[in-house]
């Protein structure tokens, strides 16, 4: 049988970066890891309406830097930054760190973020929208936004049937075994009348290393023209 590998974990250090950036000894490692889980869970639950795409945590001694990527950053920031200040105080208590800084960035194309797409499909399923309609709409939006490929899968008691099954739709390419391929992956859960439905989304945005090569070549050409 074929073995499945997590698309992001498979590409760490090549086209993907770590979401927690810190080092710790064996005694503190478990504690800091649990803190990271608490921070992410708290932010995602508190700002459900903001469309939280990612929470990146950096630690350096007693300093903690938290970067929140959201499709609606205004909800997290609040009026004149009041919400961010309140969030700073709460997270300082959670982490027991002396210096906590929260930065909020906007996700410019939420249609190309796998986690946000999966959550949007899950929300539609909870509102009793047809799963096929929700999946096809997400695929159309992603392809229009510039995706090179997208795969969407829904699993569970779809439509309330007795036997659980999986259904998926795909458009474009999805080179899962190509490490240089920039593939985003996200999951979500939909709580329906008949039980939990699982949603998985893969979005292929192109080859990252190829883009880097093009940028280097352009710079070389520009330098040659200036000489």
From Swiss-Prot:
<comment type="subunit">
    <text>Part of the 30S ribosomal subunit. Forms a tight complex with proteins S10 and S14.</text>
</comment>
<dbReference type="InterPro" id="IPR009019">
    <property type="entry name" value="KH_sf_prok-type"/>
</dbReference>
<dbReference type="GO" id="GO:0019843">
    <property type="term" value="F:rRNA binding"/>
</dbReference>
<protein>
    <recommendedName>
        <fullName>Small ribosomal subunit protein uS3</fullName>
    </recommendedName>
</protein>
<dbReference type="Pfam" id="PF07650">
    <property type="entry name" value="KH_2"/>
</dbReference>
<comment type="similarity">
    <text>Belongs to the universal ribosomal protein uS3 family.</text>
</comment>
<dbReference type="InterPro" id="IPR004044">
    <property type="entry name" value="KH_dom_type_2"/>
</dbReference>
<dbReference type="InterPro" id="IPR005704">
    <property type="entry name" value="Ribosomal_uS3_bac-typ"/>
</dbReference>
<dbReference type="GO" id="GO:0022627">
    <property type="term" value="C:cytosolic small ribosomal subunit"/>
</dbReference>
<dbReference type="GO" id="GO:0006412">
    <property type="term" value="P:translation"/>
</dbReference>
<dbReference type="InterPro" id="IPR001351">
    <property type="entry name" value="Ribosomal_uS3_C"/>
</dbReference>
<dbReference type="InterPro" id="IPR036419">
    <property type="entry name" value="Ribosomal_S3_C_sf"/>
</dbReference>
<feature type="domain" description="KH type-2">
    <location>
        <begin position="39"/>
        <end position="108"/>
    </location>
</feature>
<dbReference type="InterPro" id="IPR015946">
    <property type="entry name" value="KH_dom-like_a/b"/>
</dbReference>
<dbReference type="Pfam" id="PF00189">
    <property type="entry name" value="Ribosomal_S3_C"/>
</dbReference>
<dbReference type="GO" id="GO:0003735">
    <property type="term" value="F:structural constituent of ribosome"/>
</dbReference>
<keyword id="KW-0699">rRNA-binding</keyword>
<keyword id="KW-0689">Ribosomal protein</keyword>
<keyword id="KW-0687">Ribonucleoprotein</keyword>
<dbReference type="GO" id="GO:0003729">
    <property type="term" value="F:mRNA binding"/>
</dbReference>
<dbReference type="InterPro" id="IPR018280">
    <property type="entry name" value="Ribosomal_uS3_CS"/>
</dbReference>
<keyword id="KW-0694">RNA-binding</keyword>
<dbReference type="InterPro" id="IPR004087">
    <property type="entry name" value="KH_dom"/>
</dbReference>
<comment type="function">
    <text>Binds the lower part of the 30S subunit head. Binds mRNA in the 70S ribosome, positioning it for translation.</text>
</comment>
